[in-house]
Amino acid sequence: MTQFLNSNSKTNTRFKGFNWANSLKDVYIIGAGGTGSWISLFLSKIGHTIHNWDRDSFSFENLSGQFTLTSTLGINKARATRANTRAFGCNNMYHTYDVHWDESQFAYKNANIVISCADSMDIRKRAFEYWKKYQLAKTNRDASEMNIFIDTRMSAVTGEIYMLTTSKHMKMYEATLFSDEEAIEAPCNLKATTHCAATLAGLVVAMFNNQVSNKLDGFYIQEVPYKTTMNLNTMQIITSDSND
């Protein structure tokens, strides 16, 4: 594990008036590829502490969809993403783990906020089960505590975001999980685009900020949908909540 800290961050100058910009969290991000790398950048700009897992290294093909630079090709994705956020002016605390995530990686951690950007349904399911078990086992819950599980799924021009903030969301989300064998593999030259990954990541961070703001205000006026579907071919973004 490696980390980086510089407490003199000035990356929030233009938005520090928002309440969410001054409520920094520990965020656990599984994956540093398509959406994971962009989400890590956007959350680092705010100043959150990032915990980022990925065993793979950036390759030339990743330049077409992921937040990486030619100078970090061949470097582990988690460590490279941290380095790339530094190149873009971020100096938040950023922990990296150059291994595939498994349950032991969350041991003894306050894993309240988990964002799954894994390319494996198996890891998505296991990460969710760990997060759910951790949440349900709590006996003394802090009213100001943030409890969020986010799952991102993406193709070259479409994307889905599942944002779980209630026990009802947990039950609904379980029905969306399937095995890796059931997943449909897209052709190599139709798998990912930079603008789709960055747009999806932007929506994730916007909803994350809304949830933080609602929690701080004590009332829920900003939208935090359970499911968001994005299609760049039809230019549609459709949201639905557990009550729809």
Model-derived features with residue positions:
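A short helix-to-beta-strand connector/capping loop
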Residues: 89-95, 145
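S-adenosyl-L-methionine
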Residues: 1-15
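Glycine-rich adenosine-cofactor-binding loop
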Residues: 25-47, 51-59
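Glycine-rich phosphate/adenylate-binding loop
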Residues: 2-5, 21-24, 109-244
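Glycine-rich phosphate-binding loop and adjoining beta1-alpha1-beta2 segment
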Residues: 52-90
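Conserved SAM/SAH-binding loop
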Residues: 97-105
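Short His-Asn-centered micro-motif
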Residues: 30-31, 53, 97, 116-119, ...
